[in-house]
């Protein structure tokens, strides 16, 4: 997957980088006067949680002096800035995600329990096909939500994070930063597509 390739490619330590992702993140939060958001390590997917006011960054990135570390932290801070400014598309995205979680759970349940039961108790290929379509529809809601809200991700990367990074990162590293910001913007969409298959 291209997203993972880019994130790994630029997660190499740069000895000349004056800060880690966490250090730069704290500095940006302070400059943006965002005092109610913390930066925390996590084992899973990098994300900003607007309810908890927490930025979660994978432990293999957070304290590194790498392009991936600083760009991913800046991207997630982009979401914190959106939240601070009450950016309507971010609020809409959160609402949609919460509302579609039920469809994902139904789809998962039907995939694990429903489809095998249908195979066991019916010989009708039509019923099996309808059940498969319903299951795929339920599981695809996540992809649809992230596709619809992709502009929120690109806003966090290129309208919020990129101008900040231009103040701190040497020009010779900006191309790599843009690649990582693009990958960060596409992470949720890529993960949701992979989760279907």
Residue map of PLM features:
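Hydrophobic alpha-helical transmembrane segments
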Residues: 123-137
């Amino acid at each position: 997957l291209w997203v993972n390739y880019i994130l790994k490619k630029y997660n190499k330590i740069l000895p000349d980088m004056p800060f880690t992702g966490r250090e730069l993140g704290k500095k940006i939060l302070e400059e943006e006067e965002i005092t109610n958001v913390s930066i925390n390590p996590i084992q899973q997917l990098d994300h900003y949680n607007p309810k908890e006011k927490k930025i979660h960054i994978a432990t293999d990135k957070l304290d590194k002096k790498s392009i991936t570390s600083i760009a991913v932290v800046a991207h997630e801070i982009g979401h914190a800035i959106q939240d601070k400014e009450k950016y309507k598309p971010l609020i809409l995205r959160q609402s949609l995600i919460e509302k579609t979680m039920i469809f994902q759970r139904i789809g998962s349940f039907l995939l694990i329990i429903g489809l095998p039961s249908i195979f066991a108790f019916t010989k009708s290929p039509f019923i099996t096909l309808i059940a498969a379509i319903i299951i795929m529809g339920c599981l695809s809601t996540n992809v649809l939500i992230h596709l619809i809200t992709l502009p929120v991700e690109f806003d966090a990367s290129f309208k919020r994070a990129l101008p900040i990074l231009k103040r701190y990162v040497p020009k010779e590293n900006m191309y790599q930063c843009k690649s990582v910001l693009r990958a960060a913007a596409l992470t949720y969409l890529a993960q949701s597509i992979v989760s279907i298959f």
